[in-house]
Amino acid sequence: KLKIPLIHTYHTMYEDYLHYIGKGKVIRQSHVKYLSRLFANHTTGVVCPSERVIDTLRSYGVIAPLRVIPTGIDIEKFKRSDITQQDISKLRESLGLQENHLMILSLSRISYEKNIQALINGFPQVISAYPNARLVIVGKGPYVEELEELISELQLEEFVQFTGEVDNNDVALYYKAADYFVSASTSETQGLTYTEAMAAGTPCVVEGNAYLNRLFDHPSLGKTFETDEDFAPALIDYISSEVPKDPKVLEAKLYDISSTHFGEAMIEFYQDMVVYHEEEMRRKEEEDSIERIKIKLNSFKR
């Protein structure tokens, strides 16, 4: 009614979460497809955090302009120069970790779609190569009991622990205390915890996609793998490679994932969509004008 541009952001792969609503029997994939297409095609443009989202929306039949703009983070919140080595040592000690232990960190909501089970299933292979490896799982969620049963089944109680939910102010400390951050989630549209870990200076070994493969495009930042079965070999290979950190590469990447860069990209998209909206309004007015002329001509012929 107001005839002004409307920008929407589409950040969630809703199909991955349907099982939470009536065990997936109330809302189906076809409903998500229809509603997403209906809404998105009534906007001027849609912001997507990754190519995966764009590909999904195109498959739904969305024809509105789409642009990849990953959500930026507050870099300083995770760089945290105030965190000392003493702070890190104190945390590791509270987790029962010795100096020679490799702290492998998983930090997320503990739910089925986060695929933490793949990390646990692969961990026996990891500790066969690195007996000093310890998996620390941070977070809470509905899938804890199932994972605890899996840990017991694989006899990994000595090597895997849950911390529960931690205070938001302590998240950066956990990243910094870890030797490696890991994830096998396939439900991520961009993976903010990955960029948070990167900002904290912790290398990541994560299940990849088009966006993440570009994010971790330098060995000093981390490594991606393709399937659940690839997790353990990928982590073992990365640990054994002892890739040195590259501050210049990290700083360049941190700008790309910063809230500052995100803001600049959003402003540019807004400006582009204002122009696009004006052009679309003119085009529709011209089409309406031509249609009115046709109607008048037809009335004269009669």
Map each language-model feature to its residues.
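Short alpha-helical donor nucleotide-sugar binding micro-motif in glycosyltransferases
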Residues: 165-166, 173-178
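Conserved donor-binding/catalytic core segment of Leloir-type glycosyltransferases
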Residues: 98-114, 120-123
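Aromatic "clamp/platform" in nucleotide-sugar-dependent glycosyltransferases that forms part
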Residues: 186
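Nucleotide-activated donor-binding/catalytic signature segment of Leloir-type glycosyltransferases, i.e.
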Residues: 145-166
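A charged, aromatic-enriched C-terminal amphipathic alpha-helix characteristic of glycosyltransferases
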Residues: 243-295
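Short hydrophobic beta-strand element within catalytic cores of glycosyltransferases
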Residues: 203-206
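Carbohydrate-associated surface elements
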Residues: 52, 72
